[in-house]
């Protein structure tokens, strides 16, 4: 089972702590972190996410859009620490012969960090980035010469959207219930209208669109959005959608 706030409180009773599942789709906050973020039993849950509760009290566990929403409010590490960690990770990838890497979810908060990496010449590997709507908009403004082409080892490749979660966390959106479940099939993180709007946006800007869709219900939602957009005249070949 997942740990909860009580588990983390025993390890860190005073300091705010958040741990992330290896999939990136869920995580746990301790009591100090929940208090710092203002999360209570009355906190509204973002659509397409889960704030775990027990008897009306947050357990610290969150999934999908809920976890992503509160995770991005956690303060970033100091810039120098980030740059040092990035250089070490880059060297590790290069040691295995990897020369191109992907930033699979470029959020707006990460754009200043990439500006710093480019400013001091830290990028040695080619990085292709795919952002959510806000992240891609910010990156287009910050790196106009890097849209769809490499400039100083950085390229803004297009958009990324998430239509469901992860199978290992049992949040991937399925057509049939999970094993051992009567009805639970996971859930989608976007409405049909939101998915279609993102396809239209990528098509209008001739930007590639990468869609995270693990479950077959999420895959069907993405295909339906692409089919609708194609009927409306969106040039899918030009945007090169990826599932």
Q: What residues fall within each predicted segment?
A:
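Catalytic pocket of metal/acid-base enzymes, prominently hydrolases
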Residues: 2-129, 150-203
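Hydrophobic/aromatic residues located in beta-strands of well-ordered beta-sheets
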Residues: 17, 127, 209, 241-243
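Acidic-and-aromatic substrate-binding clefts and catalytic sites of carbohydrate-active enzymes
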Residues: 104-110, 134-136, 217-219
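Distinct, well-ordered alpha-helical segments
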Residues: 112-116, 139-145, 219-232
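Short helix-capping segments at alpha-helix termini
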Residues: 119-124, 149, 229-238
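Hydrophobic, small-residue-rich alpha-helical packing segments that form membrane-like cores
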Residues: 135-140, 156
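Short acidic/histidine-rich active-site segments
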Residues: 167, 207-217
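Glycine-rich phosphate/ribose-binding loops and adjacent secondary-structure elements
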Residues: 200, 206-208, 223-228
């Amino acid at each position: 089972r997942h740990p909860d706030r009580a588990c983390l409180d025993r390890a860190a009773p005073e300091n705010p702590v958040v741990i992330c599942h290896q999939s990136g789709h869920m995580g746990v906050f301790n009591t100090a972190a929940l208090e710092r973020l203002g999360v209570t039993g009355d906190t509204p849950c973002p659509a397409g996410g889960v704030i775990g509760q027990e008897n009306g009290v947050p357990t610290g566990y969150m999934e999908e859009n809920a976890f992503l929403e509160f995770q991005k409010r956690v303060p970033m590490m100091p810039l120098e620490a980030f740059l040092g960690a990035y250089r070490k990770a880059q060297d590790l990838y290069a040691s295995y012969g990897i020369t191109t890497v992907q930033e699979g979810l470029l959020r707006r908060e990460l754009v200043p960090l990439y500006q710093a990496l480019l400013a001091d010449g830290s990028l040695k590997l080619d990085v292709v980035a795919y952002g959510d709507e806000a992240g891609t908009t910010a990156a287009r403004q910050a790196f106009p010469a890097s849209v769809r082409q490499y400039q100083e080892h950085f390229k803004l490749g297009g958009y990324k959207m998430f239509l469901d979660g992860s199978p290992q966390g049992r949040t991937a959106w399925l057509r049939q219930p999970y094993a051992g479940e009567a009805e639970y099939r996971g859930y989608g993180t976007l409405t049909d209208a939101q998915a279609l709007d993102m396809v239209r946006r990528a098509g209008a800007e001739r930007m590639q669109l990468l869609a995270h869709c693990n479950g077959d219900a999420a895959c069907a939602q993405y295909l339906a959005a692409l089919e609708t957009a194609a009927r409306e005249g969106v040039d899918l070949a030009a945007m090169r959608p990826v599932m």
